[in-house]
From Swiss-Prot:
InterPro entries the record matches: Ribosomal_eS6, Ribosomal_eS6-like, Ribosomal_eS6_CS
Biased amino acid composition, Basic residues: 186-201
PANTHER family: 40S RIBOSOMAL PROTEIN S6
Lineage, top ranks: Eukaryota, Metazoa, Chordata, Cephalochordata, Leptocardii
Keyword Ribosomal protein attributed: yes
SMART domains with a match to the protein in the record: Ribosomal_S6e
Gene symbol of the encoding locus: RPS6
Keywords for the protein's UniProt record, in alphabetical order: Phosphoprotein, Ribonucleoprotein, Ribosomal protein
Function of the protein: Component of the 40S small ribosomal subunit. Plays an important role in controlling cell growth and proliferation through the selective translation of particular classes of mRNA.
Protein name in the entry: Small ribosomal subunit protein eS6
Region (Disordered): 185-244
Pfam families assigned to the protein according to its UniProt record, in alphabetical order: Ribosomal_S6e
Length: 244
């Protein structure tokens, strides 16, 4: 079985092949996200704490969290599920996945180092791969460089150097900062608030005008109704007098 071990602190990962069944036996019957020591892999792994993050069986089917079996099952998967990427909106598909319990039928087991041990592992903990991209959001740049609200974030953006051409000046690529508070943004915010206040005042004024007009129409309707009733009463009185 192959074991793919990653160390997020350095950004490195290493694939090792383990043929000895006794070294792999402590991992059997363990679930995904289970934390355990890696001392069974050898003396150089003494003190290391790892987490089982997944794996693939010999036919390439991935392990899926939450499927409590060590075999293969067919599940109806949709958007938001692991082990499946929908090609169309609302598309669902029945896919074969392996359960979250480790057994001997896996070809690759994925581990993540949570705690470093006593010795360094060559190619995993002794080297550091720098991140290609820095933070893009203004709040995260402030958090990275411990800046205040008064400091200018634009001076602290991580610029990525582009491949230099012969006889040309070195160029850098700067990401666009998101959620950056600028005078234009504050002015736009003030403008939107003023527009909202004017809209609210206009709405109140229109409501008051409509209420006055409605009261006037209702008053006119009541007066017309009273006039019709009085004229009908007078005509009925005249008819009764003429019959008498």
């Amino acid at each position: 079985m192959k074991i793919n071990i990653s160390y997020p602190a350095t950004g490195c990962q290493k694939l090792i092949e383990v043929d000895d069944e006794r070294k792999l036996r402590p991992f059997y019957e363990k679930r995904m996200s289970h934390q355990m020591t890696a001392e069974s892999l050898g003396d150089e792994w003494k003190g290391y704490l790892v987490r089982i993050s997944g794996g693939n069986d010999k036919q390439g089917f991935p392990m899926k969290q939450g499927v409590l079996t060590n075999g293969r099952v067919r599940l109806l998967l949709g958007k938001g599920h692991s082990c499946y990427r929908p090609r169309r909106t609302g598309e669902r598909k029945r896919k074969s996945v392996r359960g979250c319990i480790v057994d001997s039928n896996l070809s690759v087991l994925n581990l993540v180092i949570l705690k470093k041990g006593e010795q360094d592992i060559p190619g995993l903990t002794d080297t550091t791969i720098p991140r290609r991209l820095g933070p893009k959001r203004a709040g995260r740049i402030r958090k990275l460089f411990n800046l205040n609200k008064e400091d200018d974030v634009r001076q602290y953006v991580v610029r990525r150097p582009l491949p230099q051409k012969e006889g040309k000046k070195q160029k850098f690529k700067t990401p666009k900062i998101q959620r950056l508070i600028t005078p234009q943004r504050l002015q736009r915010k003030r403008h939107m608030r003023a527009v909202k206040r004017r809209r609210y005042a206009k709405q109140r004024e229109e409501e008051a005008t409509y209420a006055k007009l409605l009261a006037k129409r209702k008053k006119e309707e009541r007066e017309a109704h009273a006039k019709r009733r009085s004229s009908a009463r007078e005509s009925s009185l005249r008819e009764s007098k003429s019959k008498a």
